[in-house]
Regions:
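Conserved catalytic core of the tyrosine transesterase superfamily
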Residues: 1-191
Length: 191
């Protein structure tokens, strides 16, 4: 039964992380009562900073979650958590990391962690906006909220991991660039 649950759970939880930018602990701690499979909305409660927020699922992710839920309801009809092990308890971070490594290493030689899916979510959204000509300033607030950040400052972290993003942002935002990405003071520099 372990392999059956793993083969059902791994594709769903990793696609959920990839498509929503959820923190890994948010996915692991997701209670069934916080997943609305009719409306396609996940309520994130009691997470980092206790910042409750909502995530709207893409139609394809919603369909996958509905199918997964039907199968899991046959095995664990009264489960508390959305993703559970054979003992009907939520998976832990070690399970998630080990399974991510197995899958990732089978198709990639570079190093990555499950949490990198969150980083990828932010980077892909930022790149898509700039390529499609969206107003960056309007979109960053939405991204920040959907990722559960309390402030835009938390979301700005992702700029440092997107090559050449500062020049793209300067071209896109001109007069607001200094507000979005302030100059680093000498005492704040990292060596």
């Amino acid at each position: 039964i372990d392999m059956k649950i793993r083969s059902m759970t791994a594709p769903v939880i990793f696609r959920l992380l990839y498509s929503t930018g959820m923190r890994t602990i948010e996915a692991l701690s997701l209670r069934c009562e916080h997943v609305d499979l009719t409306e396609g909305v996940i309520s994130i409660v009691g997470t980092k900073g206790y910042n409750e927020h909502y995530i709207v699922l893409h139609d394809s992710m919603l369909e996958l979650m509905q199918q997964f839920n039907q199968k899991m309801d046959c095995i664990f009809p009264d489960r508390e958590y959305f993703f559970v092990s054979r003992d009907n308890v939520r998976f832990n971070s070690s399970w998630l990391s080990a399974n991510f490594r197995i899958i990732w290493d089978s198709v990639n030689s570079s190093h990555a962690t499950a949490y990198d899916l969150r980083h990828n979510y932010a980077i892909e959204n930022i790149n898509r906006w700039t390529n499609e000509g969206f107003n960056f300033y309007d979109k960053i607030a939405y991204l920040s909220k959907s990722m559960g950040h309390v402030t835009l400052e938390s979301t700005k972290y992702y700029y440092s991991i997107v090559p050449n993003l500062s020049s793209i942002m300067m071209n896109q935002t001109n007069e607001t660039f200094d507000w979005i990405v302030p100059e680093v003071n000498t005492d704040e520099e990292i060596y």
